[in-house]
Amino acid sequence: MKKQNMKRGKTMLITILVVIVSLSIIAWGIIAYLGRGQTLSVLSIEKLEGDLSLIHLAKPDNMQWKAGAHAKISLPNSIDNPQTASELVTGASKSKAKDGESSRWLTIASNSNEGEILILTHNSGSPYKKSLTNLPAGSKVELSWLDSSLSTTDSNKPFVCFASDVGIAAIRPIIKEELGKRELVLSHLSKGVMVFNNELEVSAKNHANLSYESSSSLSQSQAYLNEAVERYGNDATYLLAGQADDVNAMTKFLEDKGIDKKKIKTSRFRGLK
């Protein structure tokens, strides 16, 4: 009996060790997959209103991501870019901006099927943003760690969306992907960011399942979403993206209206500079 117990205990220990090793291998595999970087070419950079830029990057054929995803964008090394890059923009062709920051997490404003990667961002003065938004066409950047905090498994429940400022970059791909599939409500507190406004207005006209407004104040957006709250309640998923203060205020508004916090998914844009 004693030998049987020892044998059983040894077998159990081996099983536990095998499970631990297997899980470790899987975990490292996931980390390696998410963290692997790809070098992308800058196609063009549109200078929009104010300090806003829309960056167009070449998309590798095999690259896929979830709508609303963000990624780590690293500045190029000097060996990967023409010498003229440093002549055009101080620090643009170096691996680090003047403050030592060489990468930031930025949201992808396009879907995998659009043929290019769009990055919508402010240039509010940081060395990193100055370098990024002034890279000449043909420059290289590295993209890695694709992830999303707005993904959901709900197959057909309504999406009620709020975007503040450049937070529209996270919501636009979700709207494009879900058109015709579920009820969609979107209020964009634009703060002058109107780059996708015409596109969204046309989509709302052509798709009865999309209700869209461009808002001029947080209270206006809250009033717009309140109608959706009264209509859908906790049967909808609430997707909020943009400046942290606005997202926090909208989250509190929804919770005060009785929306379960599990139904609210957020993406806070903390690094607008």
Predicted region positions:
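N-terminal Lys/Arg-rich, disordered targeting/topogenic segments
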Residues: 1-9
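Ferredoxin-reductase
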Residues: 27-137, 190
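FNR/FR-type flavoprotein reductase catalytic core
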Residues: 9-18, 25, 29-35, 124-273
